[in-house]
Design a protein with these regions (language model features):
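Charge-lined substrate channels and their catalytic hotspots, especially those that engage the 3′ end
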Residues: 1-170
């Protein structure tokens, strides 16, 4: 299985990749996986992280405003995009997380520069890799909709569950 991060890493290592070659590098053979790759490529193009040139080759945009970081959230609801030891952390407001969870590898765009001793503020544009594939949660009904509420209070988003599937334990 590929991630947005593996797509970007493969494109950064080359001058341009054709779709078939990218599929080979990512070891994609199934039609369903190719459909998922198409969706990911369109999303990355829309975010202006990659582009497709006139030769139908995909390239990584060098001067992109996006930074790769890891999300760290506190139980009090404060979230930061951590970039590394020597780089300043970026504050992410709860409504700008775009369903990123604590520990996820993400692409962040700075929307407000830091001043004095305040951190810059940013928005999560793309989740590159999920840190947790499994989420332990409790199921609650809110306004006739069914939600999974994460037990880990560092995960700030609730997940709406389909009503058709009545296998939820209450």
């Amino acid at each position: 299985m590929f991630t947005s991060s593996s797509i970007i890493n493969n494109l950064k290592q080359s001058e341009g990749l054709e779709y078939k070659k990218l599929c080979r590098l990512l070891k994609i053979t199934k039609k369903s996986d190719k459909d998922k790759l198409d969706i990911a490529l369109k999303a990355l193009e829309t975010l202006e992280i990659i582009n497709k040139n006139e030769d139908d080759e995909y390239n990584c945009i060098k001067d992109s405003d996006h930074l790769v970081a890891k999300i760290r959230c506190s139980s009090k609801g404060y979230c930061f995009a951590v970039r590394g030891k020597d780089k300043e952390d970026i504050y992410i407001k709860e409504n700008l997380l775009n369903y990123a969870w604590n520990g996820d590898k993400v692409l962040v765009r700075i929307i407000k520069e830091g001043y004095r001793r305040r951190s810059p503020e940013g928005i999560v544009d793309c989740i590159l890799e999920r840190s947790n594939q499994i989420l332990l949660s409790k199921v609650e009904i809110i306004n006739n909709d069914v939600y999974a509420i994460p037990i880990d209070d560092r995960i700030l988003s609730k997940i709406k569950l389909p009503k058709e599937n009545k296998k939820y334990t209450f």
